[in-house]
């Protein structure tokens, strides 16, 4: 496995692979890897070569968010990549990714102003800008992203279409702890009491998905059922609960096909997200 920190060197390796007609699966991460990331790597191994990038991107954090305290363990991440058959770990530093006087950004006027975008202004501009750079550097064939960041998946897919990137976005299922909590690097922030309270998040998601699959149509009643579960936990503060069209992120009044149920909450000081996606309803 190659551990690369230079953009120039990464591009050279990719160029060599492409000259031998090798396909590339790419998993973008901010590090502190967990089983959710490793499931993306497993999916990416259907390609000839697998690249994992590790970069805690300051541009997607707000001024009062957790950039400085975001969990980091590079040595552990590299070992996990090696143990799971990754071909290249790309770890550029800040000065390479954002040169002095950097002033070019990728932004859009739709999709990003809803859900997490409404609560975290500038977040998706940061995500799209850094991923556009990684796509240019690494030239992947398929990019593997987790459904837990469902809005991000839709936003990035939209960017790929708009800017004619020659790649595909593959959305992979949410990976959960045995008790249902969605895997997240931020789970490490939770105290024992907060960790217990956080189970209400997945419980609300599972209930809502069950109601949708049973044919319930009234979104306000489904949202209320989710809210009732979450509000039982005093350590949880709801950021949003939404039922939206998965492609547009527009709110829906009555359940139709392609529905995303999304939740964001604060458990103590830690912001966690979760969702369910139901497609193929008749």
From Swiss-Prot:
It is found in: Cytoplasm. Keywords: ATP-binding, Cytoplasm, Ligase, Nucleotide-binding, Pantothenate biosynthesis. Its main location: cytoplasm. This is Pantothenate synthetase. Belongs to the pantothenate synthetase family. One of its GO terms (biological process) is pantothenate biosynthetic process. ATP binds at residues 30-37, 146-149, 175, 183-186. The reaction proceeds by a bi uni uni bi ping pong mechanism. It catalyses: (R)-pantoate + beta-alanine + ATP = (R)-pantothenate + AMP + diphosphate + H(+). InterPro entries: Cyt_trans-like, Pantoate_ligase, Pantoate_ligase_C, Rossmann-like_a/b/a_fold. Its EC number is 6.3.2.1. Pathway: Cofactor biosynthesis; (R)-pantothenate biosynthesis; (R)-pantothenate from (R)-pantoate and beta-alanine: step 1/1. The gene is panC. Beta-alanine binds at residue 60. The active site is at residue 37. Homodimer. One of its GO terms (cellular component) is cytosol. Catalyzes the condensation of pantoate with beta-alanine in an ATP-dependent reaction via a pantoyl-adenylate intermediate. (R)-pantoate binds at residues 60, 152.
